[in-house]
Amino acid sequence: MLLLWVSVVAVPALAAPDPGAGGQRRGAARVWPVAPNVVLVVSDSFDGRLTFYPGSQVVKLPFINFMKAHGTSFLNAYTNSPICCPSRAAMWSGLFTHLTESWNNFKGLDPNYTTWMDIMEKHGYRTQKFGKLDYTSGHHSISNRVEAWTRDVAFLLRQEGRPMVNLIPKKTKVRVMEKDWKNTDRAVNWLRKEASNYTQPFVLYLGLNLPHPYPSPSSGENFGSSTFHTSLYWLKKVSYDAIKIPKWSPLSEMHPVDYYSSYTKNCTGKFTEKEIKNIRAFYYAMCAETDAMLGEIILALRQLGLLQKTIVIYTSDHGELAMEHRQFYKMSMYEASAHVPLLVMGPGIKANLQVPNVVSLVDIYPTMLDIAGAPLLQNLSGYSLLPLSSEMYKFKNLHPPWILSEFHGCNVNASTYMLRTNQWKYIAYSDGTSVLPQLFDLSSDPDELTNIATQFPEVTYSLDRKLRSIINYPKVSASVHQYNKEQFIRWKQSIGQNYSNVIANLRWHQDWLQEPRKYESAIDRWLKTPTNPKKI
């Protein structure tokens, strides 16, 4: 049945529009003859480049391909922060990370924050959520928190276990990520038993953990590592011959922030080509399983006669490096980490359309309000995607020709800011002077191996000015440093004098007890220093 269903910018252009610019509308407030239903499926760690050529050649993704054929694909969609909670906070609030102050995986939105789903409910929509949300404060382990807070204390530079792979050698094992499948089943059952009987439009959210790597159970040398875990059933969906072995810069030539990240992720050592290829293959197989869960939702809508009445949106909170730039996980502004899938299909959405404009996850909020016919709030960071995805809109240039992404969490020792335009990717760090920026021309250097910031000083200067007009990033960096100190002090005081023994057993601090006095003294010195971004 599944197979049957599947068959059937140049710098001067950056001037406008700015967020909140007078006269610029963030959407067209289109009114459908019949209000459409909406289904939003959000996965975790899905590299957006897999949804178009040439990345699409490496793994079979039939339902993503179906959405491409019957809807609109955004070829340059980005996360606003390449880590789970801050990214999701941006998506659910429509605000950039520095506005939500979601600095790490523990700090998100207030539980009572008004999301786009709340507004849609007030405008007549029935609403339901299943699966991973992760946009409010209070989640994730104390290890994540302490590592993020203390990233400026150099001695805390500790390595995780190396990334691993694990194969279930069964050709019939389909449901590998049981939790995601159960939530998908819950969503399908809700569509069948509840939504299909509604006289009002509905909005359904399904959050998936895949293709995020699994935590490794080992407590030995791979303690704290992550495992790319799949079955033979899904691995057979991957074309090994199409897997690209990423090029790496020599360790001595790596940007200092990249080296820090690579070291903490235990990727500075030697890896065989087979190891790298397996990590990437297993990751792609996990993407195939993700696609199948998206397919369950699409099939259910079709079987219930709801597909032609429903706008389906698929995206992810961020990507996965999968050994590009000597790293796995995310926490980086490189394409594998920051580029996300974004596909939309349904009534009023143009079929088989590829949109090259740069967009980001803050655009989800105004898009949802636009679909519901709700007033579009003027303080949002994002813009509705509907003018770009529907031929019913006369004006196509409402969205600015840039997007902003920022990162302030663990595995990186400097606040990071990315301004992405049609041609350029500009990455600034910390206070803007203590860490060298990066500039990539993605049209000629898609692998982002050559930093040309010093070769094109005028472009670098212009992009930095534009970035500073959007966000006072030196001030934001200082605010994050102050926040980190305050949070660590509060945690330390809650633990009491025993804090040294507690920190010794956290995920990234196993060797603390070798020289506890030295480490405690370093913590004290860090807490007493002025709140300025660290010089690297």
Predicted regions: what they are:
Residues S45-G48, P82-I83, T97-H98, L133-T136, ...:
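Short, solvent-exposed loop/turn segments at secondary-structure junctions
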Residues A90-R186, W190-S196, P217-S219, F223-H229:
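Catalytic-site neighborhoods of secreted/periplasmic enzymes
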